Structure formats: C-alpha cells, structure tokens
C-alpha cells in the first residue's frame, strides 16, 4: 500500500497532505491514539431511493486518495 510519500492526510476532502502526520508506518514510534465517536441514526423512510451520480465523482475528485483506518490511504494513487 502506498503512503503518498509518507504524507496521507485525512482532512477535508480526504486529500493527501500532512493533516494526519503521515501514514504511521511505524506505529510503535510516536504513536498517537485517536478516539472517534459514531452516531447511528435509524428511522423510517419511503421505499423510493434516488441516486444522482454523487458517488461517481468521488475518486476523481480526490485524486484517488481515500482514507482508511488510522489515517492511511486505501488505496492512494495521488501524486
């Protein structure tokens, strides 16, 4: 897995940068634990679902850099 030259940011739009301090290639050294919380919202909705192609432009919009677990790129093909 590529780490974008060691700089895989998980900031806005998941763009490559130094937002997460690199890819944490050596977790035992300078390891910082991050805690996140998730909220699950459940409800009732109509049976009709519409997709307007929003998911189509995600990869191109972010130059192929997607955030995986622990702020690593998965996959990362950004330049």
Curated annotation (Swiss-Prot):
Give any GO molecular function from the UniProt entry. Answer: metal ion binding
Q: Does the keyword Coiled coil apply?
A: no
Q: Which InterPro entries match?
A: Metalthion_15p
Q: What domain of life is recorded for the organism?
A: Eukaryota
Listed A to Z, the keywords are: Metal-binding, Metal-thiolate cluster
Presence of the UniProt keyword Metal-binding in the record:
yes
**What does this protein's UniProt record list under function?**
Metallothioneins have a high content of cysteine residues that bind various heavy metals.
Q: What is the similarity comment for this entry?
A: Belongs to the metallothionein superfamily. Type 15 family.
Q: What is this protein called?
A: Metallothionein-like protein 2
Protein source organism: Cicer arietinum
